[in-house]
Amino acid sequence: MSKFVKKIKIIKPDDWHVHLRDNEILNQVIKYTGKFYKRAVIMPNLNSPITSCLKSIAYRNRILKSMHLNYKFKPLMTCYLTNSTSPKELEFGFSKKIFVAAKFYPNGCTTNSKTGIKKISDITPVLECMEKIGMPLLIHGEEINQNIDIYDREAKFIEKTLDPLRKKFPKLKIVLEHITTKESVEYIKNNDVNYLSATITPHHLMLNRNDMFYGGIQPYLYCLPILKKNKHRMALRKAISNGDKHFFLGSDTAPHLHKNKINMLGCAGIFNAPSSLLSYVKVFEEMRALKHLQSFCSENGPKFYNMPINKETITIIKKPCKIIKKINIGRNVIIPFLSGEILNWSIESD
């Protein structure tokens, strides 16, 4: 596509990694996902994690009840894996389309992961079942150990956990989520796209770790996996700009109340739903790779999940769009990524 492109029409995208939270936060943030995306994979790490079919059905009903009339989408539910997860529960949930995937959180890796897995070998029967039935395993890929530098956790995870896992279960479908490193890009590109893929967030494509400390600590840029060196950001950008089928859209939008982002122990997570799609467009434009935007946003994900590609389209136009400054949650607020900033692209109204 020419650098002078003023309008882009693509198949309506899906977001393959979304945190909606619950209750009042859910009610206020949900429309921003619905505005841009047809389907969304919903993360299960609530305060009370989604560990069963019954919990998933109840949470999905709360999501559907909260949806904005004009911004509806299909929530795709996931199961939070624990040492108590039953293979039969997973198989039943997957067969009945209650779950589209199961999520592996290493213990202590991120928000609400205290009941996550300490050793992946502890859930071998679950993984055997998932490989057998073709159920995707979604992975937060960080090796959690106080002796491992936080900037090295993702690379160490590939070496110590992911590579042995794939050798043991070669036909287990795996999504390495929100990748942040050159090592992840290289490892994934060298493996079968039918069994290993990755999602990439807009903030890891746009920022490096210097941004988190520019002019002082920037709590709203603190996320996990943490922002990395610029060489890693450039590896991510190169991966998507080449049209590689291994990579697809997963925003990892993660809302937290302002007071919880700026307190003594600030929460990890970036709420980017109001700007995520437009941010991806910005990156693809900068990389002169707009011809690959549709495959990354709308095609690679459903192909990996063996789901139909959406029939609807969305039109993006070269028109300034100001990102909302804040979202009110009772007496509290949530501040979105790129709050108050102006992006060069907008969604064309019907």
Swiss-Prot record:
Gene Ontology BP terms:
'de novo' pyrimidine nucleobase biosynthetic process; 'de novo' UMP biosynthetic process
Record note on cofactor: Binds 2 Zn(2+) ions per subunit.
Q: Recorded GO terms, molecular function?
A: dihydroorotase activity; zinc ion binding
Residues binding Zn(2+) 1 are H17, H19, K103, D252
Active site per UniProt: D252
Which cofactor is essential here? Zn(2+)
| SUPFAM superfamilies found in the cross-reference section | Metallo-dependent hydrolases
User: Mind telling me which GO cellular component terms the entry cites?
Assistant: cytosol
- EC number(s) stated in the UniProt entry for this protein: 3.5.2.3
Identify the enzyme class.
hydrolase
Described by its record, this protein's role is as follows:
Catalyzes the reversible cyclization of carbamoyl aspartate to dihydroorotate.
Please describe the quaternary structure of this protein. Homodimer.
This one is known as: Dihydroorotase
